[in-house]
Amino acid sequence: MRWLALVLGALLLAAPARAADAAGAQVLEHKGRWESGYGAQFYNVVGRLKNTSGHELRYVKLRIEALDEHGNVVARTDTYNESAEALAVPDLNPRELLESGKVKPLPADAEERFRGSFLKEETPAFTDYRVKVIETPAATPMKVIETPAGPSE
């Protein structure tokens, strides 16, 4: 029996362990394809991610990189989980959006979609792409603002 325990222990040590995602979120799946619309051609990447941090996240920021035949990055774009897509809009102030509460936090273990694209006319030729999680800040409790007491009657 002791021999069996030693063998099982050795097998467990030798088995590859799946480490928790250090970034706090995991890309579950993604697909990319050329599309056209609004008079432009673009390579659209859509996918799903999961909050693996064990706590609520303010947002998940991802980087999609276009790769040439040698694996070199020829273009990149940053994007966010679906609930936080407004953070990527150039005309909006991300800090104000986050402080206003307009960006819904991503609960622990929740899954959500993401998307990003490359315009054909602005992107060098590429043969593949990759998606990486680059930011996963923890959601912080909102401050409670006390209102002054009204006049006593």
Map each language-model feature to its residues.
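Low-complexity, acidic Ser/Thr/Pro/Gly-rich terminal tails and inter-domain linkers that flank the onset
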Residues: 19-48, 52, 148
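Bacterial N-terminal signal peptides
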Residues: 5-14
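Short coil/turn motifs at beta-sheet boundaries
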Residues: 38-40, 57, 109
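The feature marks short-to-medium sequence segments in extracytoplasmic or secretory-pathway proteins
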Residues: 55-100, 105
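Terminal connector regions
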Residues: 99-153
